[in-house]
Amino acid sequence: MINRQLSRLLLCSILGSTTLISGCALVRKDSAPHQQLKPEQIKLADDIHLASSGWPQAQWWKQLNDPQLDSLIQRTLSGSHPLAEAKLREEKAQSQADLLDAGSQLQVAALGMLNRQRVSANGFLSPYAMDAPALGMDGPYYTEATVGLFAGLDLDLWGVHRSAVAAAIGAHNAALAETAAVELSLTTGVAQLYYSMQASYQMLDLLEQTRDVIDYAVKAHQSKVAHGLEAQVPFHGARAQILAVDKQIAAVKGQITETRESLRALIGAGASDMPEIKPVALPRVQTGIPATLSYELLARRPDLQAMRWYVQASLDQVDSARALFYPSFDIKAFFGLDSIHLDTLFKKTSRQFNFIPGLKLPLFDGGRLNANLEGTRAASNMMIERYNQSVLNAVRDVAVNGTRLQTLNDEREMQAERVEATRFTQRAAEAAYQRGLTSRLQATEARLPVLAEEMSLLMLDSRRVIQSIQLMKSLGGGYQAAPIVEKK
């Protein structure tokens, strides 16, 4: 007897295993995931030599010691519409992860149903259409009532839901990194516009000084013409110069207005609440890049972190698509009361219990599962290729911005020498005027080359500040990858 039971158990096990194996759909085609760039590939070219420095710090703008800039950035971070949109994307990604996770949990619902029906005398339940109280039938009208609890659980043995939840969590982590990328773009954008405006203020001051010098020359030449001491050519030449300077002044004032309006839109200020921006000196520029990039660059660039999480999410989606080829199991159950007579609904004899284990075997699907897997794998490989190119672009940004900044530093050193040379010439002209060896007009006009070279120096300083902010942005702006968000 025992041997017969063991034989039956063994036979059932063999049949069950055979059913499970045969119930798996055939994966006709699935390629391996594309390779991601290795950390040792993330470095600058050997012929690029830049000054070494550390990574940018969080809230990097505070190191510039500019209260106006601090106030503008804080206002931007507290009221920016793009940042608010990014945070809403975080919430959406989180809710999607919660939704998928909830679908894999035990589902319990209370059920109440009242069904007033007339039983057909020619149907499957035709005996109940008779009016025979002795037999417990008082048809053809019945009022069936059902109350109870319904429960269902999907046994995720192969990880279909688990992988989908992991992909949603990856998308949420990507959204967190994207929010940091938006913050970085906003802060650097505000700083660049702010210092562009400061450079315009200083340029306007130099142009007004230039105009004062030329205006003195115009009046001096006009006086000489009036006294018949010289021809009108120098006078009209000076007039042409002052008109050219007036044109430059008008252009710079227009540029200040344009920059202010761009800044207004970026910080989210209205027509009447734009803060006044007072002129300040341009900050000192910190140059240099970290000694090595490698994996550290991936962790410090929020855009790369977002791409990395999207890659991971795509790989989880592939796992979920593969798991669909295996049999799926679920369990449904009902416990409650059911009666075709309302007066007997809550009696003990109306109790009902249903236990329904389910098995789904994907035998023939017309190629749907394979098409889904192939498309999901292709999307994942596309994301990997996009990530690899983003990493290469990030290294390029560091190299290009670092090289540009170093070139500007070299140009500034040479321009500073030119400024000093023209100042020497100006001092010599003033000394000659003090000794009575030259006229006041010549001594005054000797300042024009100095102002011109100072304008060139200012333009280089402005470009250096903007470029240093761009380099800092390409290094991540002090961002560090946040701890991984996992589902509890």
Swiss-Prot record:
Q: Does the keyword Transmembrane helix apply?
A: no
On whether Signal is a keyword of this UniProt record, the answer is yes
**Disulfide bonding pattern of the chain:** none
Gene Ontology cellular component list = cell outer membrane
Query: Topology versus the membrane, per the UniProt entry?
Result: Lipid-anchor
Any Pfam family matching the protein: OEP
Q: Which domain of life is it from?
A: Bacteria
Signal sequence bounds:
1-23
The record places the lipid (S-diacylglycerol cysteine) at: C24
- Where does the record place the N-palmitoyl cysteine lipid attachment? C24
**Gene Ontology BP annotations:** response to antibiotic
Under Gene Ontology molecular function, one entry of this record is: efflux transmembrane transporter activity
Compartments where located: Cell outer membrane
Q: Which UniProt keywords apply?
A: Antibiotic resistance, Cell outer membrane, Lipoprotein, Membrane, Palmitate, Signal, Transmembrane, Transmembrane beta strand
Q: Which family does it belong to?
A: Belongs to the outer membrane factor (OMF) (TC 1.B.17) family.
For this protein, the record's NCBIfam families field holds:
outer_NodT, PRK09915.1
Q: Which PANTHER family match?
A: MULTIDRUG RESISTANCE OUTER MEMBRANE PROTEIN MDTP-RELATED, OUTER MEMBRANE CATION EFFLUX PROTEIN
Q: Per its database record, what is this protein's job?
A: Could be involved in resistance to puromycin, acriflavine and tetraphenylarsonium chloride.
What assembly does the database describe for this protein? Could be part of a tripartite efflux system composed of MdtN, MdtO and MdtP.
Q: What is this protein called?
A: Multidrug resistance outer membrane protein MdtP
- Organism expressing this protein natively: Escherichia coli O6:H1 (strain CFT073 / ATCC 700928 / UPEC)
